[in-house]
């Protein structure tokens, strides 16, 4: 009968291996595993597999998929369902006005960290030349974003992790900034190259004992070295401030990212090292996130 045939047709459509059905199955799996942005993540990963933008995915949802695309997509979805950050699965993360390459050797750039870029550009909007040091440069997102906007600024980035620097250099080449920046593998204590108008840093600032309470996708996949701020969360901040007080020019500025509850401790450390506090800037969630200070 016609109704049976119609039922059969509709059943067939469920098993058609097209974009929409694969995304729906992925959505169900991610939801089951408590992934908040299940739909968006499914679309982003499909875009990544097909090398098309999300608009294409949505407009061509009935397009059939090749077996290879399906297996690659399902593999990514399985990894996402176990909490692996989406940026590590696609190898990319949007930050400020650009896309940065990332992998598990670098922290995933956060929207909160864009505050540093925004504030630097605001403070120095009339400045044509400037030397910048980025301590713990990671993917390069802060330093490279600033220098892309201010073509006559020169930058130096240091990181203790060679693999982070490799990723940073990759981003530098991608953004065609090779002649504007230099990188050194060094820990903060032993670095003694140059004097700077401006130092920026997003150091590890999470209390070691609290690391285990972070969201599982952060603690399981992101580099611990980029998160662990010692027993009081301030050990790397102290080192950055110490070193900055040596390497910064008189009246030079330090832009420092901090944890939401570290404002008073950080202010004291800065004042003890001869810094004047210009302002503390809040992030989108209204938490204290960035301290701007001047070496006097």
Model-derived segments and spans:
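N-terminal amphipathic/basic-hydrophobic helices that include classical n-h-c signal peptides
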Residues: 1-16
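A short N-terminal interaction module
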Residues: 17-69, 73
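Conserved hydrophobic residues forming the short capping helix/wall of the S-adenosyl-L-methionine
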Residues: 30, 124, 172, 244, ...
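Residue-level signal for inorganic ion chemistry
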Residues: 45, 83, 113, 142, ...
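Conserved SAM/SAH cofactor-binding pocket of Class I
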Residues: 114-213
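Mobile active-site "lid"/loop adjacent to the S-adenosyl-L-methionine
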Residues: 205-236
């Amino acid at each position: 009968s016609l109704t049976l045939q119609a039922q059969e047709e509709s059943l067939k459509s469920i098993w058609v291996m097209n974009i929409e059905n694969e995304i729906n199955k992925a959505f169900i799996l991610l939801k089951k595993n408590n992934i908040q942005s299940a739909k968006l993540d499914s679309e982003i990963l499909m875009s990544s597999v097909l090398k098309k933008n999300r608009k294409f995915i949505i407009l061509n949802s009935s397009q059939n998929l090749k077996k290879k695309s399906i297996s690659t997509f399902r593999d990514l979805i399985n990894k996402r369902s176990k909490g692996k950050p989406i940026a590590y699965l696609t190898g990319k993360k949007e930050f400020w006005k650009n896309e940065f390459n990332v992998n598990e050797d670098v922290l995933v750039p956060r929207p909160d960290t864009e505050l540093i870029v925004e504030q630097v550009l605001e403070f120095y909007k009339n400045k044509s030349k400037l030397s910048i040091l980025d301590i713990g440069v990671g993917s390069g997102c802060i330093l490279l974003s600033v220098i892309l906007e201010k073509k006559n600024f020169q930058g130096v980035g240091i990181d203790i992790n060679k693999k982070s620097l490799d990723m940073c250099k990759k981003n530098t080449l991608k953004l065609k900034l090779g002649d504007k920046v230099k990188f050194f593998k060094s820990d903060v204590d032993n670095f003694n190259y140059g004097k700077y108008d401006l130092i920026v840093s997003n150091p590890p600032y999470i209390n070691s004992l609290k690391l285990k309470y972070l969201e599982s996708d952060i603690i399981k996949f992101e580099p611990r070295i980029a998160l662990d701020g010692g027993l009081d969360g301030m050990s790397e901040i102290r080192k950055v401030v110490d070193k900055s007080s040596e390497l910064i020019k008189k009246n030079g500025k330090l832009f420092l990212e901090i944890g939401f509850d570290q404002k008073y401790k950080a202010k004291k450390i800065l004042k003890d090292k001869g810094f004047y506090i210009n302002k503390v800037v809040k992030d989108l969630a209204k938490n204290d996130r960035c301290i701007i200070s001047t070496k006097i």
